[in-house]
């Protein structure tokens, strides 16, 4: 997926709910399509609406960050996309054109709590292979697990157990599991939020490389504005109660991006300020 660095650095535009999704013929196909999505939860005070009138499309090979204040429903929206939370009446959610009815084929959720998502009694390669078991042959499982570990730089740690790996390496195992399943949709919930600064930047660049080489569609929840601008093609900002998408910001920075050079660009700083203003305006 290429980005035209000659375009303006900070542009925005919501696709109207009535506008047809793009479907090939030189345009990016829509992997995930949401219209009028709402979510209600039970609380001590009765039913409470968390999300309302969410309209969004995730396009083939796109990396989209979802931001907003704590409690605005960012994780809830990801869980809707992977079929773990049922949206309210009138909601339309499709993945690859198919209405969502449970976890969709080809979608993988990457959690912030990497330690809890890996099985400590399984080796790294067997953790990566977990989602493939019973679906493909043993030979294909081995090939796909090996290829995924190679892609995230962990081929030499295939026989290790997760508890022997650093936090950053464990998070790479989660990413490899998604790659092994040939995921068309990676749903990442603050995957680097619990890591130290150096490991975090390293994994940001690892994700950028994997995204460039394999082109999965990625929806990425983060509270880190710099991270969102650095990684994303677009940033969606949730605000309000119940939350809606209050802003959509296109990130037209050249790729591949560099932790120092990119973040020194005037365009990066303009985007950073714009995202900050969009979030803090939700009072």
Question: What spans do the regions from the language model cover?
Answer:
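A short, flexible loop at the N-terminus of ABC-type nucleotide-binding domains that lies
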Residues: 21-34, 39-53
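Conserved ABC transporter NBD signature motif
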Residues: 90-102
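The feature captures the beta-strand-to-loop junction immediately N-terminal to the Walker
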Residues: 67-69
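Conserved ABC ATPase signature
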Residues: 161-165, 169
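Helix-to-loop junction immediately C-terminal to a conserved catalytic motif
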Residues: 82
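A short, proline-enriched helix->beta-strand linker immediately N-terminal to the Walker B motif
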Residues: 180-184
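Conserved ABC ATPase "signature" region
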Residues: 136-157, 209
């Amino acid at each position: 997926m290429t980005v035209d660095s000659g375009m303006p650095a900070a542009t925005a535009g919501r696709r109207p709910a009535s506008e047809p999704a793009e479907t090939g013929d030189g345009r990016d196909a829509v992997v995930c399509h949401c219209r009028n999505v709402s979510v209600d939860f039970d609380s001590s005070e009765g039913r409470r609406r968390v999300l309302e009138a969410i309209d969004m499309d995730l396009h083939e090979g796109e990396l989209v960050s979802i931001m907003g204040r704590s409690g605005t429903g960012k994780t809830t929206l990801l869980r809707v996309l992977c079929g773990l939370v049922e949206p309210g009446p009138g909601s339309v959610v499709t993945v690859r054109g198919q209405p969502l009815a449970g976890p969709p084929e080809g979608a993988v959720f990457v959690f912030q709590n990497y330690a809890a998502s890996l099985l400590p009694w399984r080796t790294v390669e067997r953790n990566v292979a977990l989602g493939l078991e019973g679906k493909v042959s043993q030979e294909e499982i081995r090939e796909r697990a090996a290829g995924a570990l190679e892609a995230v730089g962990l081929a030499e740690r295939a026989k290790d157990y997760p508890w022997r790996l650093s936090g950053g390496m464990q998070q790479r195992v989660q990413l490899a599991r998604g790659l092994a399943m040939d995921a068309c949709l990676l749903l990442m919930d603050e995957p680097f939020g619990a890591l130290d600064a150096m490991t975090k930047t390293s994994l940001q660049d690892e994700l950028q490389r994997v995204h460039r080489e394999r082109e999965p569609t990625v929806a990425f929840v983060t509270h880190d504005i710099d991270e969102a601008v650095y990684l994303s093609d677009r940033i969606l900002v949730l605000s309000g109660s119940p939350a809606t998408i209050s802003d959509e910001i296109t990130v037209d920075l050249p790729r591949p991006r560099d932790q120092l050079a990119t973040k020194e660009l005037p365009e990066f700083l303009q985007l950073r300020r714009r995202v900050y203003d969009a979030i803090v305006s939700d009072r």
